[in-house]
């Protein structure tokens, strides 16, 4: 008896990851490149001078949703400062990185925040302040409390890390990823709500007028 042939069913195409752009800002030698390299490749190099901008990508899963983080690592040297502003455009999040052993880098991170605010609309970009090099805490010039108080005053996320020891590096990027997804979902719900209200109202009726 001939067996019935089953019609092959097309497989559902895997959903594409949702893409978010993340920029790393801060003075030279604070460890921006080291943080990105540690997170993306679990590698560490103490000296990674960036010329202009370096680019990394990583796909992460937040619950059932895949996110693709496009990580733009900007150069911290003053001569590249104006060029780095070009990478602000379209950014969803920014990490303001400073070296906890250098007070000047902490003050410079505050200037980077002002630059961001001048380029982008308030609330347009999610910002986290990151104090790097906790492995050198005996040489600390910026206390945890100083960083936390400034972050709180500006409504920023805040965390301290060590790219060298791989301390809280994944936590920094994963926290940002979770916040970005939550923001995106909330904005999507708000837009759908506005659209539903507009549909319920329907087109405005024009009043008829009679000519006498």
Swiss-Prot record:
- Extract the InterPro entries matched here: P-loop_NTPase, Rab_GTPases_membrane_traffic, Small_GTP-bd, Small_GTPase
- Indicate which residues the UniProt annotation says bind GTP: 31-33, 50, 76, 132-133, 135, 163
An example GO CC term for this entry is: basolateral plasma membrane
Show the SMART domains listed in the entry: RAB, RAN, RAS, RHO
| SUPFAM superfamilies, per database record | P-loop containing nucleoside triphosphate hydrolases
Q: Where is this motif: Switch 2?
A: 75-91
Modification sites for Phosphoserine: 29
Sorted alphabetically, the Gene Ontology BP terms of this entry are: anterograde dendritic transport; cilium assembly; endocytic recycling; establishment of melanosome localization; filopodium assembly; immunoglobulin transcytosis in epithelial cells mediated by polymeric immunoglobulin receptor; intracellular protein transport; melanosome transport
Query: What domain of life does the UniProt record list for this protein's source?
Result: Eukaryota
Induction remark = Up-regulated by forskolin probably through the transcription factor MITF.
Q: Which cofactor does it need?
A: Mg(2+)
Specify where it is mainly localized: membrane
For membrane topology, the record states: Lipid-anchor
Q: Give the positions of lipid attachment, kind S-geranylgeranyl cysteine.
A: 209-210
UniProt-recorded Gene Ontology molecular function terms: GDP binding; GTP binding; GTPase activity
Q: How is its activity regulated?
A: Regulated by guanine nucleotide exchange factors (GEFs) which promote the exchange of bound GDP for free GTP. Regulated by GTPase activating proteins (GAPs) which increase the GTP hydrolysis activity. Inhibited by GDP dissociation inhibitors (GDIs).
What EC number(s) would the UniProt record show?
A: 3.6.5.2
The places in or outside the cell where this protein is found are: Recycling endosome membrane; Melanosome; Cell projection, Dendrite
Give the family per the record: Belongs to the small GTPase superfamily. Rab family.
| Function, as annotated | The small GTPases Rab are key regulators of intracellular membrane trafficking, from the formation of transport vesicles to their fusion with membranes. Rabs cycle between an inactive GDP-bound form and an active GTP-bound form that is able to recruit to membranes different set of downstream effectors directly responsible for vesicle formation, movement, tethering and fusion. RAB17 is involved in transcytosis, the directed movement of endocytosed material through the cell and its exocytosis from the plasma membrane at the opposite side.
Q: What is known of its domains?
A: Switch 1, switch 2 and the interswitch regions are characteristic of Rab GTPases and mediate the interactions with Rab downstream effectors. The switch regions undergo conformational changes upon nucleotide binding which drive interaction with specific sets of effector proteins, with most effectors only binding to GTP-bound Rab.
Protein name (Swiss-Prot/TrEMBL):
Ras-related protein Rab-17
What organism is this sequence from?
Answer: Homo sapiens (Human)
